From Swiss-Prot:
It comes from Campylobacter jejuni subsp. jejuni serotype O:6 (strain 81116 / NCTC 11828). InterPro entries: dsRBD_dom (IPR014720), RNase_III (IPR011907), RNase_III_dom (IPR000999), RNase_III_sf (IPR036389). It comes from the Bacteria. Homodimer. Digests double-stranded RNA. Involved in the processing of primary rRNA transcript to yield the immediate precursors to the large and small rRNAs (23S and 16S). Processes some mRNAs, and tRNAs when they are encoded in the rRNA operon. Processes pre-crRNA and tracrRNA of type II CRISPR loci if present in the organism. It is found in: Cytoplasm. GO terms for molecular function: double-stranded RNA binding; metal ion binding; ribonuclease III activity; rRNA binding. Residues 4-127 form the RNase III domain. The active site is at residues 44, 116. This is Ribonuclease 3. Disulfide bonds: none annotated. GO terms for biological process: mRNA processing; regulation of gene expression; rRNA processing; tRNA processing. The keyword rRNA processing applies.
Length: 224
């Protein structure tokens, strides 16, 4: 049995029903009669509302579109995996030996899903306000500067606006290669403008690599 008391201490929440926490920590590969997918579904909805309400009050003058971008920057696999890592959540997840040997304890998708499942479990046992308090504490701890300019790093849109305005061209993003094991896949992206390569970047997803390449291009153009 994993020492889930350590996890409860990190969460600052002690489950009355320990089986509910174990349920939230059980990945589908563990081959039990239950897994955390349904709790993940619930936790995802709770976190979406928690973050939406938080941003609504924190950025009272911002338009709906900006709030949606902010929420998308916080409510995603990468952000939740970061929070999960701060809790050492991978050490507590129940999964098959095969999944663990395949890097399952470090997979952002598994970590993110488990975090959502835990929030869903807290909501079930203690109610929305309790889940909200814990979720916000974790978010603020891991993202101390919740600021639009910091979170919304949409370099692709900014670059496109500049290039279309100045030369009437839209940047193109080409996948040069994908490499590495499945759980640590890397993508190399080349940013092409008017048939010429302007920048190149490597990241763990195509979207992230495209954003990095766009940032490099903006720096070259003196727009950052």
């Amino acid at each position: 049995m994993k020492n889930i008391e350590k996890l409860e201490q990190s969460l600052t929440y002690e489950f009355k029903d320990k089986n509910l926490l174990i349920h939230a920590l059980t990945h589908k590969s563990f081959k039990k009669s239950y897994n955390n997918e349904r709790l993940e579904f619930l936790g995802d909805a709770v976190l979406d509302l928690v973050v939406g309400e938080y941003l609504f009050h924190k950025f009272a003058k911002d338009a709906e579109g900006d709030l949606s971008k902010l929420r998308a920057a916080l409510v995603n696999e990468k952000s939740f995996a970061k929070i999960a890592n701060s809790l050492n959540l991978g050490d507590f997840i129940f999964m098959s030996v095969a999944e663990e040997n395949n890097g399952g304890k470090e997979k952002p998708s598994i970590l993110s899903d488990a975090l959502e499942a835990i929030i869903g479990a807290i909501h079930l046992e203690a109610g929305f306000e309790f889940a909200k308090t814990i979720a916000l504490r974790l978010i603020e701890k891991n993202f101390p500067q919740i600021d639009a300019k910091i979170l919304i790093k949409d370099y692709k849109t900014k670059l496109q606006e500049i290039t279309q305005g100045k030369i009437g061209q839209t940047p193109q993003y080409e996948t040069v290669r994908a490499f590495g094991p499945d759980h640590l896949k890397q993508f190399e992206i080349a940013l092409m403008l008017d048939g010429k390569e302007l920048a190149r970047a490597i990241a763990g997803s195509k979207k992230e690599a495209q954003q990095m390449a766009a940032k490099i291009a903006l720096e070259k153009l003196g727009a950052l």
